[in-house]
C-alpha cells in the first residue's frame, strides 16, 4: 500500500499480534468526543481507532471498549526511574484478554540518567511477542514539580537514543516515538527518520503541525468518550489502510 502523511508511505506501519484483536466489524460509531474540533474531523472517519490510557482512567471495562470499536491501546507503564503506573499490569492483561492490540509506553524524565530509566522499564514491562512495539514518550514537561527544565537538544537526543536502543533490545521490537509539536520542532525535526512516530495534534492534521514527518499513529483529541471508560480519554487513529489491519497484525512489527 502507498500512504501519504495521513496514510503514511510505508508497508511496515502495522502491527504484529499473534492473538488477533478481531475484525473491524465493531466500528467507531460508539466512540465520541466531548469537545470535537473541526481541524481533526478526518480522524473520526478513519477506521482503525485506538486510545491511550494510564491510572487516570481508573478501572477500564476493556471488553466494552473493544466492542465499541477500540482496536489498539497505548498503556502507560513507567516514568523516569522509579514510577510504575499503578494500573499498568491490570490494563496490560485486560486489554490483551479483550483482544485489544496494546503497547507499553515510558514517559521520559529529563532529570534522570537514561540508563536508569531503561533499567526501570525493563524491570517492569515483560517482553511479550504478542504486544505492539513499545513507545518512548518524548516531550517537555515544564509543569513538572520536580523536573520542569529543558535540556539541550544534543543531550535530549542522547537520552532518547539510549532509551530507544534499550527498549528495542528488551522487547525485540523497534520502538515507536510519541511527541508533540513543540518538542518535535525543538529537538526531533529531521532526526530519527527510520522510526515510526505517534504524533499529538488536536487542532489540525499532523502534516499541518510537523515539518517533514511521516506518521503511523495520530493522537487527535484528549476529550474522547469511549464506552467502558469513565470520564475522558485520549483517542488515536492508525494512519494506514484500514483494509490491511488484520493482515498487518499478523505480519509486521515482528520481533527482530
Residue ranges and their predicted role:
Residues 2-9:
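Bacterial N-terminal signal peptides that target proteins for export
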Residues 133-211:
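Catalytic domains of cell-wall/extracellular-matrix polysaccharide-remodeling enzymes
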Residues 21-24:
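Bacterial signal peptide processing site
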Residues 64-70:
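A short, Lys/Arg-enriched amphipathic alpha-helix followed by its capping loop at the start of a domain
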Residues 29-53, 192-256:
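Functionally critical loop-and-helix segments that line ligand-binding/catalytic clefts
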Residues 11-19:
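Bacterial N-terminal signal peptides
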Residues 43-63, 75-162, 168-170:
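Substrate-binding cleft of extracellular glycoside hydrolase catalytic domains
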Residues 71, 101, 174:
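Residue-level detector of anion-binding/catalytic polar loops
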Amino acid at each position: 500500500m502507498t500512504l501519504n502523511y495521513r496514510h503514511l508511505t510505508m508497508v511496515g506501519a502495522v502491527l504484529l499480534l499473534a492473538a488477533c484483536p478481531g475484525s473491524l466489524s465493531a466500528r467507531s460509531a460508539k466512540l465520541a468526543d466531548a469537545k470535537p474540533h473541526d481541524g481533526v474531523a478526518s480522524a473520526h472517519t478513519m477506521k482503525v481507532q485506538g486510545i491511550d490510557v494510564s491510572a487516570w482512567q481508573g478501572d477500564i471495562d476493556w471488553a466494552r471498549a473493544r466492542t465499541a470499536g477500540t482496536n489498539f491501546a497505548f498503556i502507560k507503564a513507567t516514568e523516569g526511574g522509579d514510577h510504575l503506573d499503578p494500573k499498568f499490569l491490570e490494563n496490560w492483561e485486560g486489554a490483551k484478554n479483550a483482544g485489544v492490540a496494546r503497547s507499553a509506553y515510558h514517559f521520559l524524565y529529563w532529570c534522570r540518567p537514561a540508563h536508569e530509566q531503561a533499567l526501570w522499564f525493563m524491570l517492569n514491562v515483560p517482553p511479550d511477542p504478542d504486544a505492539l512495539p513499545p513507545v518512548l514518550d518524548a516531550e517537555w514537561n515544564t509543569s513538572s514539580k520536580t523536573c520542569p527544565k529543558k535540556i539541550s537538544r544534543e543531550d535530549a537526543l542522547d537520552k532518547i537514543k539510549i532509551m530507544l536502543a534499550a527498549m528495542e533490545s528488551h522487547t525485540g521490537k523497534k520502538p515507536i516515538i510519541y511527541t508533540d509539536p513543540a518538542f518535535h520542532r525543538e529537538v526531533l525535526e529531521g532526526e530519527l527518520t527510520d522510526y515510526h512516530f505517534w504524533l499529538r495534534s488536536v487542532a489540525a492534521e499532523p502534516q499541518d503541525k510537523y515539518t517533514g514527518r511521516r506518521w503511523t499513529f495520530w493522537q487527535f483529541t484528549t476529550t474522547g468518550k469511549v464506552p467502558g471508560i469513565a470520564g475522558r480519554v485520549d483517542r488515536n487513529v492508525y494512519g494506514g489502510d484500514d483494509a490491511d489491519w488484520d493482515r498487518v497484525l499478523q505480519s509486521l512489527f515482528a520481533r527482530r
